[in-house]
């Protein structure tokens, strides 16, 4: 404010002028503070709204994922899985495995099943061929849909001939051999036998095609939105694919089944006695064997599933338990043996053991 007399000479303000100036200053300060409070309230309201929406999303996902026919009470592990599903679009926020020079696998996902936390990931949402990790779904669908796995199944000549033409891994059943559903299950999981997988498909659904439909329906139920199956074995096919994230959902779900967990963590199994194999066939886990045969320590790993085709590379799903905490690791696309095993050993050592 300009305090000037009639002659233009600046003079000191009067008491009234000082009071007026101070009042205007106080009013301006009060207006600024009110504006700041309004802005703060709006910010808080926005944060509260976001939290409400997140809570609603979690509740909605829980409802969708509920498989108990109306029961929406989730266990701690189920809630952890829901939280991990929500994180799919946020994978970039998790620590990407940076030592690319020392890691052969193209896709990686390490999860703490107890908390649902993604500990380590690399290209986890990228769709790729998954080879015999497909058989995890084959086992799940068979376990859930065959009323009695003691039921007999006669291995067909056409299955044996087809697998031979594909140079596929087999458990060693003979054409015409009468085996049980349990034999087929262990045959598919431990030595990754195509005869076990195709036998399970026929035993469960009556045909390979009908069984594949069941596999895809289960994938949809589990929220495996980046997954599609075209066969029960994992043979290379452009239409048979998944990603590390989806496979973690499948593997976690499968491990909740006591029978699957027992099979996946077994190191050996002997099939029932038949005319063709009076002493049964001794099956050996390619997970246990893969670590041991290559001189790589298993650490806390107690089971899992291997996979290999030329297009898919070396794939591995492992289950580990340390200090009461459960972990699953999916690695896909390692260039050659034993890199999928050494990758697993390295990742567990760095992110779990330390």
Question: Model regions: which residues?
Answer:
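N-terminal targeting leaders characterized by basic, low-complexity, disordered sequences
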Residues: 1-34
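Hydrophobic single-pass membrane-insertion segments
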Residues: 58-72, 352
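Domain-terminus/edge residues, biased toward the C-terminal soluble/receptor-binding domains
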Residues: 224-228, 236-354
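Alpha-helical transmembrane segments of integral membrane proteins
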Residues: 42-46, 182, 261
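Active-site-adjacent loops and short helices of periplasmic peptidoglycan-processing enzymes
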Residues: 2-3, 8, 18-20, 67-245, ...
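Perimembrane helix-loop junctions in membrane proteins
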Residues: 35, 53, 66-70
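N-terminal Sec-pathway targeting helices
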Residues: 33-51
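Alpha-helical transmembrane segments
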Residues: 51-59
């Amino acid at each position: 404010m300009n305090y000037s007399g009639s002659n233009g000479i600046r003079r000191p303000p009067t008491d009234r002028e000082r009071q007026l100036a101070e009042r205007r200053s106080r009013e301006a300060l009060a207006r600024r503070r009110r504006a700041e409070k309004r802005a703060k309230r709006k910010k808080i309201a926005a944060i509260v709204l976001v939290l409400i929406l997140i809570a609603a999303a979690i509740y909605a996902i829980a409802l969708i994922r509920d498989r108990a026919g109306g029961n929406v009470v989730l266990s701690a592990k189920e809630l952890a899985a829901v939280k991990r599903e929500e994180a799919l679009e946020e994978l970039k926020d998790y620590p990407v495995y940076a030592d690319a020079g020392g890691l052969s696998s193209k896709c990686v996902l390490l999860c703490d099943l107890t908390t649902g936390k993604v500990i380590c990931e690399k290209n986890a949402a990228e769709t790729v061929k998954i080879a015999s990790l497909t058989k995890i779904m084959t086992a799940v669908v068979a376990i859930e849909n065959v009323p009695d796995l003691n039921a007999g199944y006669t291995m067909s000549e056409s299955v044996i001939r087809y697998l031979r033409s594909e140079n596929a891994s087999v458990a060693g059943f003979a054409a015409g051999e009468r085996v049980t559903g349990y034999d087929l299950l262990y045959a598919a999981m431990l030595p990754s036998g195509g005869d076990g997988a195709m036998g399970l498909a026929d035993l469960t659904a009556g045909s390979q095609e009908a069984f594949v439909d069941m596999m895809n329906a289960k994938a949809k139920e589990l929220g495996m939105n980046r997954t599609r199956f075209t066969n029960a074995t994992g043979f290379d096919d452009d239409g048979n694919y998944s990603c590390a994230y989806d496979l973690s959902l499948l593997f976690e779900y499968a491990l909740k089944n006591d029978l699957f967990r027992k099979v996946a963590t077994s190191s050996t199994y002997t099939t029932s006695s038949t005319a063709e194999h009076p002493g049964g066939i001794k099956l050996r886990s390619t997970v246990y064997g893969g670590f041991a045969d290559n001189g790589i320590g298993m650490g806390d790993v107690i089971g899992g599933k291997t996979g290999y085709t030329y297009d898919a590379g070396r794939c591995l799903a492992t289950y580990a338990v340390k200090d009461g905490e459960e972990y699953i690791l999916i690695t896909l696309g390692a260039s050659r043996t034993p890199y999928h095993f050494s990758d697993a050993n390295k990742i567990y050592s760095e992110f779990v053991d330390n």
